[in-house]
Amino acid sequence: MVFDLIRKFVGTRNDREIKRIQSYVDAVNALEDEIKTLSDDQLIAKTSDFKGRLANGSTLNEILPEAFAVVREASMRVLGMRHFDVQIIGGVVLHEGKIAEMKTGEGKTLMATLPVYLNALTGKGVHVVTVNDYLATRDSEWMGKVYKFLGLSVGMIYHDIPEDERKAAYSADVLYGTNNEFGFDFLRDNMKFSNDQMVQRELNFSIVDEVDSILIDEARTPLIISGQAEESTDKYYQVNQLIPQLKKEQHYLVDEKAKSAALTDEGIVLMEKLLNIENLYDPANIETLHCLNQAVKAHGLFKNEVDYVVKDGEVVIIDEFTGRMMSGRRYSDGLHQALEAKEGVKIENENQTLASITFQNYFRMYNKLGGMTGTADTEAEEFSSIYKLEVIVVPTNQPMIREDCPDVIFRTEKEKFDAAIEEIKELNEIKRPVLVGTISIERSELLSKKLKKAGIKHSVLNAKHHEQEAEIISQAGQPGAVTIATNMAGRGTDIVLGEGIPELGGLHILGTERHESRRIDNQLRGRSGRQGDKGSSRFYLSLEDDLLRIFGSDKISPLMARLGMEDGQPIEHTMVSKAVANAQKKVEAHNFDIRKHLLEYDDVMNRQREVLYALRREIINTENGKEILLDMADEVIDDALADIADEKIYPEEWDIESLNELLERQFAVHIEKPNDNDLLLQGSTKLELEHCNREKLHGAVMVAVTRAYEAKEVGVNTDFMRHVEKVIMLQVLDALWKDHLLGMDHLKEGIGLRGYAQKNPLTEYKKEGFDLFSNMMARIKEESTEYLFKVQVNNEVEMADEFVSKPQNVVEHRGNTNTLEKPVTIRRDEDKVGRNDPCPCGSSKKYKKCHGK
């Protein structure tokens, strides 16, 4: 009550922000008449003028009003479109690195030209991120006319773009592309062997279109680049043939809430009998157990025409948020192979991860990040806590007059669809257009059959028809149009009302099921009533819908009984709508916890990735790989002497034999103890044990190792030797990183079991992950030095081919959506790291100069 009164007099934070930004709008409007008088050449010259002012110390905020006024005028001359005041407000929000929520049809695409132009003046590049190639192409060509008119370069990246064109695109002032392409380019760059091969430059400023879809809906599935593993696919066929003998509830359990499936004790016993295995959990049978678990998931959780389709003999994933086919993408960890076995198509080899990153961690690397969408306010807390992004709701240019009717709910799905068909029929008779939203291909095709039976002409837009997506959705507002669309397929394309449609009430939205997220439902509703148009929406639900069955039945079923529901009769009551909304809030909170928890796990990998990639860049950028190599040698010697030359014992008792074995194996350097008093290095350098300590021994060994390496360099072209050093260190690093990723996957897979031992799984994951990482960093040094000290570099012409980075046969795909245990925040255990390694704290300093002091 008190807060309501305060808000009434002071306004919300959103109100205060809009009021503050209004001063920018007034400044832009004040310049409009002056800018209009400029000739085309004078308007174009403003770009050079702005760049000069920035070079002389002006800030972007200082030139913002004039730059926005220039873009507004350029847009009028080139596109015939003038930015509304609300679009200027949205432009300022984006420029300040926040999220602008603007209702559908308010002109987000045009709004983005304002901050894009302003920030592109710095010469550091601006990335405009879209959800699909169609929108990237459309916007780069459409809005690109404004940028090009003002003298800025525009680029676009897509999946099959040639490498030289991709690199050129990244040097453009403004670059359009999909979230997947930007993420994969980052991963690919960190697998390259020279700066010349890399395409991305510093990640400066990004504006993410449909930001909720990219940063929230897709946050749980990582981008993965993988190479083929060598495991046989036969086990998937073998196990798949046994699955039909399992009975649900008796032999395996499915938890739809947690999206997991697992064998029961009875199921394990049956499988051991069928496979003729004594103990399924014996380490020797771990691969069989893994295949079995994935097969149970494939049969128990994943449905054809809902989660995937079979097209041209391949299992193709359906994006659960957009309803689009994700050709070329594969589930990881053997799940895709299990689905291929289930559907009886050819099983492709399992992939092993070479590089991966989540969108959460990729987009947090930009110096500045902004986003725009029609629906973000419901997820404001998540944007704030994970991305440090504030959501500002931008007012509409025209008042919203769409009528959102209460939900109607039926007992069964059949009753629901029958009633929906009846309403579509009534509206179709008066030629009023209807957009019908479904949540899966299966449902859209079921509804399509019913409409055909009723003789109603209609269009279907789902993953199977995505090629005609823009055309189908753009016609959805024409007289008599009935369009069935899965989820938000067609998002980003305007639905323009045909002649006479506003008089009929505008476009009617008919939702056939509530989505887990209120935001997705709001997106569907938002297709109607754009820019002050008339429109209406209504959702038809049944107690058999997944959302109500899984999350809301305990509250809604008794409510229905209390309201006296009869077969075939719907209930339309605010109490029902409220109960449905509460079920959605419950799911949203559950999914937020999962994403937040997954981020805590991924942050462990992210810290390691940052350190590893920093070392990789250091090797690539150095002009003298020999220095890094000798630093590595110094670390290897230091680690060895810490064990062998213990200062707590007399030098005469040091295990020189073990030290000699290591030096000969690692560096081809010899040390011996000819008598009780002396050490002899390389047969010439003499050390008296009586006056020796670990530091002196370290120094002498390092001198001998350096000389041995310099002797190897004699007669070899210096530049070629430096090239060989780089390539070998990078090859060793990449091979060990690949193995480390596999080890981390295995660790993550089994870490949940630590909870049974009263240990926190996240704490254990951090600790053991750090141990694995420390061991990998030590092995990088050991293997790099051993290889380079022993390799014979005789004839550079013969060896040139061997030391050229070759393109790898890799697959790019999205990972699986996983769930993990509830988190407990914990400080990481610091373990031993080499003195010259980058500090795992992320400071970018060497460990010895940071936390290793």
Give residue spans per PLM region.
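Generic detector of ordered secondary-structure context
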Residues: 1, 63, 284, 331, ...
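Short Cys/His-rich zinc-binding micro-motifs
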Residues: 829-848, 852
